[in-house]
Swiss-Prot record:
It catalyses: N(2)-acetyl-L-ornithine + L-glutamate = N-acetyl-L-glutamate + L-ornithine; L-glutamate + acetyl-CoA = N-acetyl-L-glutamate + CoA + H(+). GO terms for cellular component: cytoplasm. It comes from Bacillus cereus (strain ATCC 14579 / DSM 31 / CCUG 7414 / JCM 2152 / NBRC 15305 / NCIMB 9373 / NCTC 2599 / NRRL B-3711). Pfam families: ArgJ. InterPro entries: Arg_biosynth_ArgJ, ArgJ-like_dom_sf, ArgJ_beta_C. The record marks 121-122 as: Involved in the stabilization of negative charge on the oxyanion by the formation of the oxyanion hole. This is Arginine biosynthesis bifunctional protein ArgJ. One of its GO terms (molecular function) is L-glutamate N-acetyltransferase activity.
C-alpha cells in the first residue's frame, strides 16, 4: 500500500485530546496507593468505534462488558479505565462489578449505558474494590487540557516506566484531521491481541464497520508483532473512537484519501507498539527485526516474531554479544519453508552471515554498535519480494526480579 506520507505530519505536542471533541482525566483513588489509577476519555458526541481484543481464552470481565457495549451500536462516548486491579478471574461478581462500572460512567457523564467502555489492568484474581471505584468515577471531570491527557496516560500504567503517547495530523478532503493514541504495556506482552491497552482518538469521519476493518488489518502488522516475554494476557485491547467532527466526507475504501487515513492509523499503532516493546519490564534495549525477501508477508512476520521472541536472542542482545547463531537457529524453528543456503543476516547494519556463510567483522565496531539503545536485525531470505517486521526488547536480570515480586 502506498501511503501519502506528505499528507501525514507528526504532532510532537499532540495528545488524545488534540482531535476535536475529546477530553480526558486521570486521578488518584487508592488502587495504587499514591499513584494515578483511574481515568476516562470522553467524547462530546457518540463516536464511531472499533476494537480488537486479547485472544486468551480467559477473558477479563471489563473486556466482556466493552464487547457488549461496542456490539450494541458500534458507538462509544466514554472509556473508563482503572489500573492496579485487572478484575480478571473474579467470577460472576467481577462481571457484575464491570457492568456497574459501566452504569456509573453512564450516569455520571449523562449518556447511554452502551456508549461506555470499561477497561482494567493489574493483578489478576483480586476482587475490584467497588467502594473506591464508585467514589472515583463520581469525581471524574475530564477537560481538554493537555495536562489531563497526560494524567490519563499515567492512570493506566502498571509496571510501565514511561507513559506512551503519539499524535499525527493528516489532510483529508483538504481539511486537517488529527489522530492520537495512548498505550500501556510492559510485561506479559505477546499480543494476538494481548497484554496491553491502547486507546486511540480521531476526529475523522468514518463509520464503525470501515474503522473496524482498518484497525483489524493494522493490528496484525503492529501490536501483534511485538513480544516482551511470550505471555498473553486476559484483559487487553485496543479501542479507536472517531468523533467525525473534522467534517470531511465519510472516509471509506473508495475515498481518495483512504490510504492517508490508514497510513496515519498505522503510524499511531506502530509508534505505540514500539514504545511498549522498548518499555518491556527490565528492558535496556529495543530490538527490531526485519525479514526481507520472503514468499509471503505472513511468513516474513512469523520469522521476525520468532527471532524477537527468542529468549536466547534477547539475552545475547542484553549481553551485547553478536551471537548470530541464535538468530539463524530461530529462523529454522519458525516452521516457515526456507532455503538454508541463501540466508543473509546483518546486525546493526554489519554483515554477519552471507549466503549462510559466516562473515568476518570488526569485533570492536560491533561491540560499539551493540551498546546502542536500539538494535536492528535484518534477515534476507532471497525467496520472494515480501517483508515483515517485529519488535521486542532484551531480557535482563531485572525482568526476573520485577516478576518474582509483582504481587508484593
Amino acid at each position: 500500500m502506498m501511503i501519502k506520507v506528505a499528507s501525514i505530519t507528526k504532532l510532537e505536542n499532540g495528545s488524545i485530546v488534540t482531535p476535536k471533541g475529546f477530553s480526558a482525566i486521570g486521578t488518584v483513588n487508592g488502587l495504587k496507593k499514591e499513584k494515578k489509577d483511574l481515568g476516562a476519555i470522553v467524547c462530546d458526541v457518540p463516536a464511531s468505534c472499533a476494537a480488537v481484543y486479547t485472544t486468551n481464552q480467559i477473558q477479563a470481565a471489563p473486556l466482556q462488558v466493552t464487547k457488549d457495549s461496542i456490539t450494541a451500536e458500534g458507538k462509544l462516548q466514554a472509556i473508563i479505565v482503572n489500573s492496579g486491579n485487572a478484575n480478571a478471574c473474579t467470577g460472576m461478581q467481577g462481571l457484575q462489578d464491570a457492568y456497574e462500572m459501566r452504569v456509573l460512567g453512564a450516569e455520571h457523564f449523562g449518556m447511554k449505558e452502551n456508549y461506555v467502555a470499561v477497561a482494567s489492568t493489574g493483578v489478576i484474581g483480586v476482587p475490584l474494590p467497588m467502594d473506591i471505584i464508585r467514589k472515583g468515577v463520581a469525581t471524574l471531570i475530564p477537560t481538554k487540557e493537555e495536562s489531563e491527557a497526560y494524567s490519563f496516560s499515567e492512570a493506566i500504567l502498571t509496571t510501565d516506566l514511561i507513559t506512551k503517547e503519539t499524535c499525527y495530523e493528516m489532510i483529508i478532503d483538504g481539511k486537517k484531521v488529527v489522530i492520537a493514541g495512548v498505550a500501556k504495556g510492559s510485561g506479559m506482552i505477546h499480543p494476538n491481541m494481548a497484554t496491553m491497552l491502547s486507546f486511540i482518538t480521531t476526529d475523522a469521519h468514518i463509520e464503525h464497520n470501515v474503522l473496524q476493518t482498518a484497525l483489524s488489518q493494522i493490528t496484525n502488522h503492529t501490536f501483534n508483532q511485538i513480544t516482551v516475554d511470550g505471555d498473553t494476557s486476559t484483559n487487553d485491547m485496543v479501542i479507536v473512537m472517531a468523533s467525525g467532527l473534522s467534517e470531511t466526507r465519510p472516509i471509506n475504501m473508495e475515498h481518495t484519501d483512504w490510504e492517508t487515513f490508514v497510513g496515519a492509523l498505522q503510524k499511531v499503532c506502530e509508534d505505540l507498539a514500539k514504545k511498549i516493546a522498548q518499555d518491556g519490564e527490565g528492558a535496556t534495549k529495543l530490538i527490531e527485526v526485519n525479514v526481507l525477501g520472503a514468499q509471503t508477508n505472513e511468513e516474513a512476520k512469523k520469522i521476525a516474531k520468532q527471532i524477537v521472541g527468542s529468549s536466547l536472542v534477547k539475552t545475547a542482545i542484553h549481553g551485547e554479544d553478536p551471537n548470530w547463531g541464535r538468530i539463524i537457529s530461530s529462523i529454522g524453528q519458525s516452521e516457515v519453508a526456507i532455503n538454508p543456503n541463501t540466508i543473509d543476516i546483518t546486525l546493526q547494519s554489519i554483515s554477519v552471515l552471507k549466503n549462510s556463510e559466516p562473515q568476518t567483522f570488526s569485533e570492536e565496531k560491533m561491540k560499539e554498535r551493540l551498546q546502542e539503545d536500539e538494535i536492528v536485525i535484518n534477515v534476507y531470505l532471497h525467496l520472494g519480494e515480501e517483508t515483515g517486521s517485529a519488535w521486542g526488547c532484551d531480557l535482563s536480570y531485572e525482568y526476573v526480579k520485577i516478576n518474582a515480586c509483582y504481587r508484593t
